[in-house]
């Protein structure tokens, strides 16, 4: 608006009556302003219309304190953004509300405000403009603007000092207490769980123990005809209390011979395979009866081991590989203790048997019993289940000889002697010894064999025959036989130097070596050994006689084109044989200082290579034969010995000359430009040169 319109409006208001004062409650409700002091008269700009600057007859109050006449208020409500035309304060909700109303209340309020206003301005309009035409004073006193009212608002307090920290501490304490309670409960649970588990196991075990007799009784009542295998057989109802002895009987178990005699028939009947017919089982029972009688009559400490050899059944497994842990701790001189021990042989027959005989037991028929519970018939009877049996071939019958048969007392003693000798060999072999036993062990072996042979000479000789240590008259000498003769001669040569200590050893050794010659020579030499006196000279003479008889017997047995290639008459003639010309195994292993070739198998080689061992053994043989130093009394033998010595010297000289000749031939000329400068040069390179 222009200033002229303002002046006109002010002039028109002169002479209007002063409005009456408005109650304070109504003013507060309309303006939303807290008034702590008595209300002051409104300013002229507040009472005028904010839009047209005229005092409205019907006015509407805005939230900002300004008022609008009816027309300006309608325009402000219709506008897109209704706001106060003077202070630009937005009041959209107010404008819409006032547009709906009839503006009556606002008009009354504004009328009262106008009546309270300055009389000089309101009087002319109230009077109808009578004084408006009068002259206006030049300077109109205006009321000074009122001071802004002070409104005290209390500050909003979010929290007290330290209240947040206290709240945080309390929350943390609650969390810690909760964790502690959870941990305590978990520990208690962990403590109770093992106890509950142990109590449950204990209850289960007690329940099983209480149920076992009932189950066994029920099984025996419902399944009386249960069958089982011979190896895994369960005891029947009558034998339930007795402990069941397995078929694998350990060697160290000290069961008595009476137990063997009483249970032999039952074991044989149980060990019959399912493929055996009734006739075979009847035959085995017939064979078992006389065998048990023979065993009962021969129940002596010396015949104890042979029971394990002769009274074993075909399908029985009690005769497994021997365990020598007990024999290792026995002294060497306890031959009777070795004989009295019950040590089963590895094979169940006196002949050697391979290892497949024990593995064939895995192919025995297996009895398969059904595991389903038995069915009951409608009348209450129990239906016994079918028993399924597998019937493979009985391989044991074809591969093993039957050994449960009667034998004469002489054969029994002979086999007992074989058994004892095998025990001694296995005990004294260096592969099974835990302590050092040098050559004294060999002498002890020969002395003990001599002592046992004096009591039973015939059995000892038969033992030598059966153990494979002598020559065969039918087939003639072989390489192991020659090995045996050389070892015997060397044994006598070594033992001749110690004839005062062991005077009976050479004679008995010679007796055992004279067996292959013939029955007459054997009996003659045995009589000489038994009737010999105690003088060392007589024993040495008989030793020489034995050597001559042995060599003559060997000459008669050897063929003309023999490897030895000559007539052996003395024990020194063995040195004339060139060991490089002999086949392997003839004199390579027997020229050492072993007394018996059967004990050579378990010994360690003294040298790391065979040629060193052979050379060393030849030297030892010459030294041992030279230590004897006994000149033969027979001139023929003396001449033969000189001849052999000359041949040996000639042979040594020839060997030395041959070595020198070979060394000269191997010497290569290394002169520059020689053809044979490099022996390994190829022909192509030589041609290129």
From Swiss-Prot:
Lineage: Eukaryota, Metazoa, Chordata, Craniata, Vertebrata
The EC number(s) this enzyme carries: 2.3.2.27
Signal peptide as annotated in the record: none
Protein name: E3 ubiquitin-protein ligase RNF169
GO terms classed as biological process: DNA damage response; double-strand break repair; negative regulation of double-strand break repair; protein ubiquitination
Alphabetical UniProt keywords: Chromosome, DNA damage, DNA repair, Isopeptide bond, Metal-binding, Nucleus, Phosphoprotein, Transferase, Ubl conjugation, Ubl conjugation pathway, Zinc, Zinc-finger
Described function: Probable E3 ubiquitin-protein ligase that acts as a regulator of double-strand breaks (DSBs) repair following DNA damage. Functions in a non-canonical fashion to harness RNF168-mediated protein recruitment to DSB-containing chromatin, thereby contributing to regulation of DSB repair pathway utilization.
Gene name as annotated: RNF169
GO CC terms, sorted: nucleoplasm; nucleus; site of double-strand break
InterPro entries per record: RNF168/RNF169_E3_ubiq-ligase, Znf_RING, Znf_RING/FYVE/PHD, Znf_RING_CS
Assembly and binders: Interacts with DYRK1B.
Pathway it works in: Protein modification; protein ubiquitination
Motif (LR motif): 670-682
Domain comment in the entry: The MIU motif (motif interacting with ubiquitin) mediates the interaction with both 'Lys-48'- and 'Lys-63'-linked ubiquitin chains. The UMI motif also mediates interaction with ubiquitin. The specificity for different types of ubiquitin is mediated by juxtaposition of ubiquitin-binding motifs (MIU and UMI motifs) with LR motifs (LRMs).
Secreted in keyword set: no
SUPFAM superfamilies noted in UniProt: RING/U-box
PROSITE patterns: ZF_RING_1 (PS00518), ZF_RING_2 (PS50089)
Pfam family, one: zf-C3HC4_3
Basic and acidic residues composition bias: residue spans: 110-128, 178-224
């Amino acid at each position: 608006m222009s200033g002229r319109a303002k002046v006109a409006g002010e002039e028109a208001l002169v002479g209007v009556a002063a409005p009456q004062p408005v109650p304070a409650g109504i003013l507060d409700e309309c303006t939303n302003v807290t008034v702590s002091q008595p209300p002051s008269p409104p300013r002229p700009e507040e009472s005028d219309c904010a839009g047209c600057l005229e005092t409205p007859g019907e006015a509407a109050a805005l939230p900002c304190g300004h008022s609008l006449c009816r027309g300006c208020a309608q325009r402000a409500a219709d506008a897109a953004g209704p706001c106060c035309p003077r202070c630009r304060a937005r009041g959209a909700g107010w404008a819409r509300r006032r547009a709906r109303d009839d503006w009556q209340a606002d008009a009354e309020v504004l009328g009262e405000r106008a009546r309270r206003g300055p009389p000089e301005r309101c009087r002319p309009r109230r009077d109808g403009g009578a004084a408006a035409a009068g002259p206006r004073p030049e300077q109109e006193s205006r009321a000074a603007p009122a001071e802004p009212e002070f409104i005290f608002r209390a500050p909003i307090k979010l929290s007290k000092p330290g209240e947040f920290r206290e709240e945080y501490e309390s929350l943390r304490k609650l969390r810690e207490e909760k964790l502690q309670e959870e941990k305590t409960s978990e520990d208690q649970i962990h403590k109770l769980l093992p106890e509950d588990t142990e109590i449950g196991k204990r209850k289960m075990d007690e329940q099983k123990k209480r149920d076992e007799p009932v189950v066994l009784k029920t099984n025996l009542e419902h399944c009386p005809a249960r069958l089982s295998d011979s190896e895994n057989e369960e005891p029947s109802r009558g034998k339930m209390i007795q402990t069941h002895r397995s078929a694998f009987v350990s060697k160290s178990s000290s069961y008595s011979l009476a137990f063997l005699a009483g249970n032999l028939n039952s074991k044989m009947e149980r060990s019959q395979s399912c493929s055996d017919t009734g006739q075979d089982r009847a035959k085995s029972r017939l064979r078992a009866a006389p065998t048990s009688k023979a065993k009962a009559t021969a129940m002596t400490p010396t015949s104890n081991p042979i029971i394990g050899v002769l009274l074993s059944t075909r399908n029985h497994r009690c005769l497994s590989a021997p365990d020598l842990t007990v024999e290792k701790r026995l002294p060497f001189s306890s031959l009777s203790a070795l004989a009295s021990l019950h040590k089963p042989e590895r094979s169940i027959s006196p002949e050697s048997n391979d290892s497949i005989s024990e593995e064939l037991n895995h192919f025995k028929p297996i009895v398969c019993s059904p595991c389903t519970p038995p069915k009951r018939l409608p009348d209450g009877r129990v239906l016994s289940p079918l028993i399924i049996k597998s019937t493979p071939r009985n391989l044991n019958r074809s591969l093993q000889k039957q050994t449960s048969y009667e034998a004469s007392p002489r054969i029994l003693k002979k086999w007992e002697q074989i058994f004892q000798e095998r025990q001694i060999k296995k005990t004294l072999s260096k592969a099974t010894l835990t302590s050092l036993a040098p050559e004294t062990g060999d002498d002890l072996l020969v002395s003990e064999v001599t002592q046992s042979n004096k009591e039973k000479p015939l059995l000892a000789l038969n033992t030598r025959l059966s153990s494979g240590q002598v020559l065969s008259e039918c087939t003639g000498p072989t390489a192991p036989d020659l090995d045996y003769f050389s070892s015997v001669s060397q044994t006598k040569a070594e033992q001749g130097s110690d004839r005062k200590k062991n005077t009976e050893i050479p004679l008995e050794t010679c007796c055992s070596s004279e067996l292959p010659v013939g029955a007459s020579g054997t009996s003659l030499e045995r009589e000489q050994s038994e009737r010999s006196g105690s003088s060392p000279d007589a024993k040495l003479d008989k030793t020489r006689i034995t050597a001559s008889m042995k060599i003559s017997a060997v000459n008669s047995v050897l063929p003309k084109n023999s490897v030895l290639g000559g007539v052996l008459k003395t024990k020194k003639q063995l040195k004339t044989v060139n060991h490089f010309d002999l086949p392997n195994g003839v004199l390579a292993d027997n020229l050492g200082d072993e007394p018996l070739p059967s004990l050579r198998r378990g010994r360690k080689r003294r040298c790391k290579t065979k040629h060193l061992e052979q050379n060393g053994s030849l030297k030892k043989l010459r030294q041992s034969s030279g230590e004897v130093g006994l000149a033969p009394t027979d001139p023929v033998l003396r001449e033969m010995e000189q001849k052999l010595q000359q041949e040996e010297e000639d042979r040594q000289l020839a060997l030395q000359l041959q070595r020198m000749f070979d060394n000269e031939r191997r010497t290569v000329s290394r002169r520059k430009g020689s053809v044979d400068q490099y022996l390994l040069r190829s022909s192509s390179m030589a041609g290129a040169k």
